[in-house]
Amino acid sequence: MMQHMEERELEVKRYWNEVSDSEWYRSLRTEERLDRLQKDPKAAFYPGVLELMAKHVGDFRGKKILLPSSGDNHAAFAFALMGAQVTSADISERQLENAGQISERWNLDIEYICDDTTRLSKFGDGTFDLVYTSNGTLSWITDLAEMYRNIERVLKKGGYSAMYDVHPFTRPFTMEAWKAPEIRKSYDDVFPDLYWRVQDIVNASARAGLRILEMAEIRSADASFWYTFDELKTKTAEETANINDWKHNPMAAIPAWIAMIAQKQA
């Protein structure tokens, strides 16, 4: 079992080290994109997600925030720009290297740690005010219960766990824009794709000792939810107009994203 976990961890690490320098990820580090984020840190978050956290956490200034599976690190930059003490953790050394170059250029004091999100083995108990996982994290997690146990462990008493990811309600469908819904699998077929259900996320959090405070179901705000990076490059404004209106695009009738915030007992 342990050998299998180590093999998967190496596989995931190799994948993201390669993806970090792909055209898609380089597009997230363009001067135009970063300049917009630096001027408006809120731009790093999907509409409604930052507001959900701020409603419960309050002012981020001075807060110790951990971002496991930090990916493009836009959220890490944003929290640091808002005055938080940020620690970015990712399984990919290359992701952290690329992010570190940006934060150094911007003179942001962000700590970068290469670690597995499930175990968070390099972090002590009761360290952080907020742990935030964002889009794309959960589909790579093989043991959701362990991940939330360790998130609860590294949180201070009264600290917060926040997540934002693709809504599990989309999982049974092919999610092809403009087409009638086409079911490809049962909602309960979690494996082998590791597509967690809403109950899996909620139960793993609650059983870890985190009290669910609020959940938000968020609809798609742009065309990027419906198309890959390469597909988007070929689309015109006319082709993506009304894409988030369910009367034109039937699959837009269900929420695209889910966000949740929970709290460790004080």
Predicted regions and their residues:
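Conserved class I S-adenosyl-L-methionine
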Residues: 2-61, 74, 78, 160-189
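Class I SAM-dependent methyltransferase SAM/SAH-binding core
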Residues: 64-119
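A short acidic, Gly/Pro-enriched loop at the edge of an enzyme's catalytic core
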Residues: 121-130
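A short SAM/SAH-binding and catalytic strip from SAM-dependent methyltransferases
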Residues: 129-145
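A short glycine-rich, Lys/Arg-flanked "PGG" loop and its adjoining helix->strand segment in the class I
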Residues: 145-160
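Short alpha-helix
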Residues: 192-215
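Core SAM-dependent methyltransferase catalytic element
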Residues: 208-210, 231-233, 248-266
